[in-house]
Each structure stands twice: as structure tokens, then as C-alpha cells.
Regions:
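Conserved N-terminal entry element of GNAT/NAT acetyltransferase domains
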Residues: 1-19, 23-24
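Conserved GNAT-fold acetyl-CoA-binding loop/helix
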Residues: 18-46
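A short helix-loop-beta-strand connector motif used in the catalytic cores of GNAT acetyltransferases and
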Residues: 41-58
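Conserved beta-strand in the GNAT
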Residues: 57, 62-79
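A structural microfeature
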Residues: 64-66, 90, 129
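Conserved acetyl-CoA pyrophosphate-binding loop and the N-cap/start of the following alpha-helix
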Residues: 84-97
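Conserved beta-strand-loop-alpha-helix junction that forms the acyl-donor binding cleft
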Residues: 85, 106-121, 125-126, 133-135
């Protein structure tokens, strides 16, 4: 198993990306997070932009299991395919990012996403900022 920079947009990665967009958009705060991540870029185009800029890391074993979007020392997204959750895939990806020369110092987690908050707490991080938005 390995965590590597994504080298291209494969059909497998594109499918996982679509699953992530679907899952995130259904969660509380998901639409706001996607708007922040995309910053005017259509969500389906963000994948290619992230890969070409060296911001997308993938966890690949016998199959693509998950990915992380990390830009400017900020983990913007971690996604693990549902069939591989609770197997330390997300933790492995985040720990790999922390060993990088430009290690992240912040991360996004959606309100109510206990699994993501627990992952970050497991590496010693604590919630420091909550962004409130009007309707």
C-alpha cells in the first residue's frame, strides 16, 4: 500500500471523486465546503486542476481506496471509499502528508463529521476555528 501524488486522472480516480462530491454535498455544510474548495471552478474540473498542480494524494493498494486534497499547508478534503473505511486509510494518508516538507498545519472538517474530527484528534490536532455563515 502506498500514498502517492496522483499522476493523472484515471477512470478509477474520477469515479471516486464523483462519489466524494455526492457524499460531501449531502452533508451539513457540504455545499459551502465545495464552494470554498472550487472557488468558481466547476467541481468536476477541480479534480484535473488538483492533479496537475500536485495537490491530490491518493492511497492505492490493490485498489484506489482514498485521496486527500492538500493545498498551501491546508488539508481541504480527505475521502475514503465507503468499503475501505475503518481500516486506517484516512489516517495513513494524513500521516503521510504530515511527513511532507510542506506539511499541512490546518484541515477542514464538516460540522457533525465525527469520523473526520476523530481522525484529526488522533494525530493530536484540536478544533480551533468554527466558521459561521448566514443563510
Amino acid at each position: 500500500m502506498s500514498v502517492l501524488l496522483a499522476e493523472g486522472v484515471t477512470p478509477e480516480l474520477e469515479e471516486l471523486w464523483k462519489r466524494a462530491l455526492h457524499d460531501v454535498s449531502a452533508k451539513r455544510g457540504g455545499a459551502a465546503l465545495l464552494a470554498t474548495l472550487c472557488d468558481g471552478t466547476p467541481p468536476e474540473e477541480l479534480l484535473a486542476a488538483a492533479v496537475s498542480s500536485g495537490a491530490l494524494w491518493v492511497f492505492h493498494d490493490d485498489a484506489l481506496k482514498g485521496f486527500a486534497l492538500c493545498r498551501a499547508q491546508l488539508i481541504e478534503a480527505v475521502y475514503v471509499a465507503s468499503e475501505f473505511r475503518r481500516q486506517k486509510v484516512g489516517t495513513t494518508i494524513v500521516r503521510h502528508l504530515l511527513n511532507d516538507a510542506a506539511a499541512p498545519v490546518d484541515a477542514y472538517a464538516l460540522p457533525g463529521d465525527r469520523a473526520m474530527k476523530s481522525l484529526y484528534e488522533s494525530i493530536g490536532w484540536k478544533a480551533r476555528l468554527l466558521t459561521m455563515r448566514g443563510a
